[in-house]
């Protein structure tokens, strides 16, 4: 399971001109389920991103997590994170989870995030979305939790 974390001052997701999710300071997280992922990988990814210390403390050092700050989470499904660009000029997405599996894992990820964190907004799975954000830093961090027994390529 993969997440691309972006520390933001604010972010929102629009579908057909309607805002469906909006946060102030916090994390915009693009989320991708890969083939072979289970709820265990989703849980580990969420635990990692909630505790990752990428927000400044009083001394200006990255020493606080989104949980520490009470910042928002904006979770957006993004199967293209699983792109394989090694051959040719057209990316392959065969490593992304099948749509039904991806939806199930994304829904689990969102439900668990809502159980653990006070401010969680989302996009809409498989929708054409426009994501607007104001990066803070910028700080952008890729996370990947691979299923046991698989080779971890990339972030």
UniProtKB/Swiss-Prot annotation:
Keyword entries, A-Z: Cytoplasm, Hydrolase, RNA-binding, tRNA-binding
Annotated motif Gly-cisPro motif, important for rejection of L-amino acids, positions: 137-138
One Gene Ontology molecular-function label: Ser(Gly)-tRNA(Ala) hydrolase activity
GO CC entries: cytoplasm
Its biological purpose: An aminoacyl-tRNA editing enzyme that deacylates mischarged D-aminoacyl-tRNAs. Also deacylates mischarged glycyl-tRNA(Ala), protecting cells against glycine mischarging by AlaRS. Acts via tRNA-based rather than protein-based catalysis; rejects L-amino acids rather than detecting D-amino acids in the active site. By recycling D-aminoacyl-tRNA to D-amino acids and free tRNA molecules, this enzyme counteracts the toxicity associated with the formation of D-aminoacyl-tRNA entities in vivo and helps enforce protein L-homochirality.
Enzyme class: hydrolase
Protein name: D-aminoacyl-tRNA deacylase
Gene label: dtd
GO biological process: D-amino acid catabolic process
Self-association and partners: Homodimer.
Domain notes: A Gly-cisPro motif from one monomer fits into the active site of the other monomer to allow specific chiral rejection of L-amino acids.
Originating organism: Paracidovorax citrulli (strain AAC00-1)
Subcellular location field: Cytoplasm
Enzyme Commission code(s) on record: 3.1.1.96
Entry's family note: Belongs to the DTD family.
Highest taxon in the source lineage: Bacteria
Reactions listed under catalytic activity: glycyl-tRNA(Ala) + H2O = tRNA(Ala) + glycine + H(+); a D-aminoacyl-tRNA + H2O = a tRNA + a D-alpha-amino acid + H(+)
